[in-house]
From Swiss-Prot:
It comes from the Bacteria. NCBIfam families: L12. Homodimer. Part of the ribosomal stalk of the 50S ribosomal subunit. Forms a multimeric L10(L12)X complex, where L10 forms an elongated spine to which 2 to 4 L12 dimers bind in a sequential fashion. Binds GTP-bound translation factors. This is Large ribosomal subunit protein bL12. GO terms for biological process: translation. It comes from Chlamydia muridarum (strain MoPn / Nigg). Keywords: Ribonucleoprotein, Ribosomal protein. One of its GO terms (molecular function) is structural constituent of ribosome.
Amino acid sequence: MTTESLETLVEQLSGLTVLELSQLKKMLEEKWDVTAAAPVVAVAGAAAAGDAPASAEPTEFAVILEDVPADKKIGVLKVVREVTGLALKEAKEMTEGLPKTVKEKTSKSDAEDTVKKLQEAGAKAVAKGL
């Protein structure tokens, strides 16, 4: 590939939404038969060596949208758009076919704030440590 075609590719990827990037990641993992997960051996090795406490609290969290009552869907949709920056179509897709991950690799306070906003809008949401 030429430098120009690589720059074009970078520009196209930069225009994707978070949901589209997530779908692209899944498609590439399937196509290349790989996963983008961190190796488990490295984590287990550090814990076995005593470098990390066994009961260490996670520093990164994911916010999971578990349920949206039909009568609360519009309010929840607005909150999803607010916290993710997604367009209306992508936010609507995120509120269907639950559970869905609304945010990944976020701080504990941000995850708690996001869960609180979703719950205030009427959704059932939880923050899970990664």
